[in-house]
């Protein structure tokens, strides 16, 4: 699907089911479509994948499209090994087949590579249907950090998974470059947005703690490299907002750190806005929505120079934060950043633009369905 097409003459060469797809879309106005998204990450999980899908779906609904997300909540599930808060679907194939065929989508997007993603991919390949995928999470690095499985094995599997589709969406240019080198094909840029009404500078001070206040927001787990933040020798106070499998252990190990547990909505925005620097220690995130949320609240960012921070901060890093190999040096440098510039930079990222980019990369389902 491509924005700006208003008649069949604008559509690339198509025939059969694909031509009928475009004819039906264009006959009823500005590209209304039935879009089915399959995701192993969905409510009640709280993470960047879920937040991205939730917001994009809301934007697509506002644009007049019919969108449904199929997540693990519809299936028998078991807890994920080493991370019981995440539930994985068990043998979802037949039930998922019925859901897909009942919904009769114009376009199929497979957001994750778990049991649901694998089942949806199998359904599409058996019927000769086209689909798109997305690379949200560095599972090879996550699995390696937890059980030591070599990342090259998992990337080989992921490459086969994604290359069977008609396009893999990636959040940043540096991730696109990396995945191209790893042999992934048909990569499509799909950036992210931020809720500028919720996440904004606030006058009230949230924290009654010694300044400066350095804050981390996110999952308290090994793959987030949170130890790199907790072990920093910094002045003032360190705050951790979020839950996760390492929360209890880290509380015991770092009694001087202020752990709040998870916060949402206005409370989360206040946590960002009341901080002097947002510290993002992750080495494996593919984007980092929390970076944008902090910037939208006027809070500068300190991070390693890796995919995600490198792309979001880009050439403005000196004004809105700092990135580099030394996280402590970056955190101290970020104290000098311009909070107004942080907000202005975040305003460049729109969820509507994110949804439009997603829409532009979808492909007609085609194939043969019962």
Task: Label every model-predicted segment.
Residues 300-303:
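Short hydrophobic beta-strand element within catalytic cores of glycosyltransferases
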Residues 206-241:
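Conserved donor-binding/catalytic core segment of Leloir-type glycosyltransferases
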